[in-house]
From Swiss-Prot:
The chain crosses the membrane at residues 59-79, 89-109, 260-280, 303-323, 326-346, 355-375, 384-404, 415-435. The keyword Cell membrane applies. The lineage of its organism: Eukaryota, Metazoa, Chordata, Craniata, Vertebrata. It is a multi-pass membrane protein. GO terms for biological process: apoptotic process involved in development; engulfment of apoptotic cell; phosphatidylserine exposure on apoptotic cell surface. The keyword Transit peptide does not apply. It is found in: Cell membrane. Keywords: Cell membrane, Membrane, Transmembrane, Transmembrane helix. One of its GO terms (cellular component) is plasma membrane. The gene is Xkr7. This is XK-related protein 7.
Length: 580
């Protein structure tokens, strides 16, 4: 099955390479995606997938608690300003709550519309399985609805029977109810709450269901968790970060002890920022089979790391903005431009189109105003060190300018704030060192993996079989004319025939190894090179590809594998053919 970027589907025949071979076909152009069943490939029956545990459920519940506490304290504080007659503070506080929420709800509802919509004139994706050796998947296209069925490795197209009138009526009623419910949820600004609850439901279903459905629900739970983590990351840096700077600036400007409500709002915004960053990194690592997952200990230490560094950063901003408001605005814009240019210069590869990549880089530039955010593959030690050296100098300069405007002899309160900025930043750097030295998940997940195994857990069963060819032929060194002549003359002089160009080295007879029984399962081939960490895989951000994969995955009696196109394999094959 091939899914192009325009939503159409085509059928691809069985591939000879199986689950471990690379996709040697396809144009590989930008924006063109092929998700195909590459034929029956060996999938070990004894390869269990990850399980949804109680701590995963508790993590989602804590995320919901952080979400509600952040929004509730901000709205409560805005109402307090309104009752006190402070219309300016009320307007700014409410603006930083409603505007980011509206943007995120529109984006969330747009995702829902695409995920739940159907092409015009065709029914939606329908899947069915009858026997263990039959895989049936009906994939919608723009022109017609067809069913793709493989039996004993041979694909064929069969027309899908039209649904009965009663079934079609019930289907339309159910769809209408879902549309009304989702519209109401997003109008109430609860789209993220719905996605959190849905991720929780899918995770629990993956724990309670059988093996095949367990994998299916776990896969959908990862998709939902990825969506809500990206939405929360966008919202927190559009809402919580400006709200935190605003309330701290007002607090410093008034020069009095904070009220309980103001302190709660500041604390909730700070925790929301730190929690969202750690949660995003955890979901990103959990979604990639080529990286070790982030443990909950590491996630908690990440929360503390970001909590203290962002606290020092925002307090330095608030101190400077309380005295030099115009210069603070110039500083923020200049810092954002420099950081955005730095990100663009690094040539990130997160999105599927150029314009989406530019918007993403601009959002990352906003994040870099407050904290570190890894967007480039490879070792990040030098980049982290450079970033925090710049942040340290900026914090010291902003705090120093503010302190120079105070009365040195009598204002002991100012000295305390300077010490708070310094100690908070030092604590954040300490927790960052603890994370990278003790809790950072280094290395590939459980050793080398077959490309794209959806649910890897043990390296043995999930890897390629022993009789599969996993590496392409290497390029041969060119033979010069002198070497050819010398070899010919030497062979004639010695009176011995010239040895053959290719020789087969005798090896030891294969030792029989007991292997578990295998069931035949499809390999879903994606005609795109796999994005490297810390980018999301294409099947997480391309919703067309996601819909096709979910339909194929649900219809297969055995767990399919995702297989991205290997750029290195294509280059090596081309070099080999040219050389020989």
């Amino acid at each position: 099955m091939a899914a192009k970027s325009d939503g159409a589907a085509a059928v691809a025949g069985p591939g000879p390479e199986g689950p471990a071979g690379a996709d040697r076909g396809g144009a590989g152009g930008r924006g063109e995606v092929a998700a195909g069943i590459a034929g029956p490939g060996p999938v070990e029956a004894g390869c269990p997938g990850p399980r949804y545990e109680l701590r995963d459920c508790c993590w989602v519940l804590c995320a919901l608690l952080v979400f509600f506490s952040d929004g509730a304290t901000d709205l409560w504080l805005a109402a307090s300003y309104y009752l006190q007659g402070q219309s300016t503070y009320f307007g700014l506080t409410l603006l930083f709550v409603l505007l980011p929420s509206l943007v995120v709800q529109l984006l969330s509802f747009r995702w829902f519309v695409y995920d739940y919509s159907e092409p015009t004139g065709t029914p939606g994706p329908a899947v069915s399985t009858k026997d263990s050796d039959i895989v049936g998947a009906a994939i919608s296209t723009k022109d017609s609805a067809v069913a793709f069925r493989t039996k004993e490795g041979s694909p064929e197209l069969v027309p899908r029977p039209a649904p009965s009138s009663a079934g079609a009526y019930r289907r339309r009623c159910c769809r209408l109810c879902v549309w009304l419910l989702q519209t109401l949820v997003h109008l109430l600004q609860l789209g993220q709450v719905w996605r959190y609850l849905r991720a929780l439901y899918l995770g629990l279903q993956s724990r309670w269901r059988g093996e095949r459905l367990r994998r299916h629900f776990y896969w959908r739970m990862l998709f939902e968790s990825a969506d809500v983590s990206m939405l929360r990351l966008l919202e927190t840096f559009l809402r919580s970060a400006p709200q935190l700077v605003l309330q701290l600036s007002l607090l410093v400007h008034r020069g009095r002890e904070p009220e309980l409500l103001t302190a709660l709002s500041i604390s909730a915004s700070l925790v929301s920022l730190a929690w969202t960053l750690a949660s995003y990194q955890k979901v990103l690592r959990d979604s990639r089979d080529d990286k070790r997952p982030l443990s909950y200990k590491g996630a908690v230490v990440q929360v503390l790391w970001h909590l203290f560094t962002i606290a020092a950063r925002t307090l330095a901003f608030a101190l400077f903005a309380s005295v030099y408001r115009l210069y603070f605005g110039i500083f923020i814009v200049a810092h954002w431009c420099i950081m955005t240019f730095w990100v663009i210069q690094g040539e990130t590869d997160f999105c599927m189109s150029k314009w989406e990549e530019i918007i993403y880089n601009m959002v990352v530039g906003i994040i870099y105003i407050f904290c570190w955010f890894n967007v480039k593959e490879g070792r990040s030690r030098r980049r982290v060190t450079l970033y925090y050296c710049i942040v340290l100098l900026e914090n010291a300069a902003l705090t120093g300018f503010w302190y120079s405007s105070r009365n040195f002899s009598t204002d002991f309160y100012s000295l305390i704030l300077v010490c708070v900025v310094a100690s908070s930043f030092a604590l954040g750097i300490f927790f960052m060192c603890v994370y990278y030295c003790l809790l950072h998940p280094n290395g590939p997940m459980l050793g080398p993996q077959a490309p794209g195994c959806i649910f890897p857990e043990a390296p043995g069963p999930c890897g390629p079989p022993a009789d599969a060819i996993t590496s392409p032929p290497r390029s041969l060194p060119r033979t010069t004319g002198a070497e050819r002549d010398g070899a010919a003359v030497g062979g004639e002089r010695a009176g011995t025939p010239t040895p053959p160009v290719f020789q087969v080295r005798p090896g030891l007879p294969p030792t029989p190894v007991a292997r578990p029984l295998r069931t035949e399962g499809p390999v879903i081939r994606i005609d795109l090179p796999r994005k490297k960490y810390p980018a999301w895989d294409a099947h997480f951000i391309d919703r067309r590809l996601r819909k096709t994969i979910l339909a194929l995955e649900y219809s297969s009696p055995a767990t399919p594998r995702l297989q991205y196109r290997s750029m290195g394999t294509s280059q090596e094959l081309l070099e080999y053919e040219t050389t020989v």
